[in-house]
């Protein structure tokens, strides 16, 4: 298991930034998200995306950023950037056509977006 995989697993306990609708059991919902990330986890590999509206603090729209993909499903790519120690979501149908639309935070928050 890689250090990045271990880091991801350790961060799956933090759901403090996840929106949970009324009537939803928080612990069950967070566990479902964590299990879905585990199910869609991949061997980490580098990905690039173009920052797009609404943007990401510290980056200009149109700027290319990169990170290490740790999970992927249906056009959603969960990416970790060590420089900020933060997870992001890149969106797009193929690895060479990804946008970063301002979703960042815990892995659970990113995956729930």
What are these regions (language model features)?
Residues 1-59:
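N-terminal domain-onset segments
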Residues 41-99:
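Amphipathic protein-protein interaction modules
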Residues 93-113:
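Compact, glycine/acidic-enriched structural inserts
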């Amino acid at each position: 298991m890689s250090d990045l995989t271990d880091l991801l697993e350790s961060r799956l306990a933090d759901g403090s930034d996840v929106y949970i609708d009324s009537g939803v059991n928080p612990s069950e919902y967070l566990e479902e998200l964590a299990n879905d990330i585990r199910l869609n986890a991949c061997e980490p590999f580098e990905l690039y995306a173009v920052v797009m509206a609404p943007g990401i603090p510290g980056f200009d729209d149109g700027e290319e950023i990169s990170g290490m993909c740790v999970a992927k499903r249906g056009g959603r790519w969960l990416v970790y950037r060590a420089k900020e120690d933060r997870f992001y979501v890149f969106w797009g149908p193929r690895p060479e056509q990804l946008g970063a639309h301002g979703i960042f935070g815990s892995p659970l928050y990113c995956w729930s977006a």
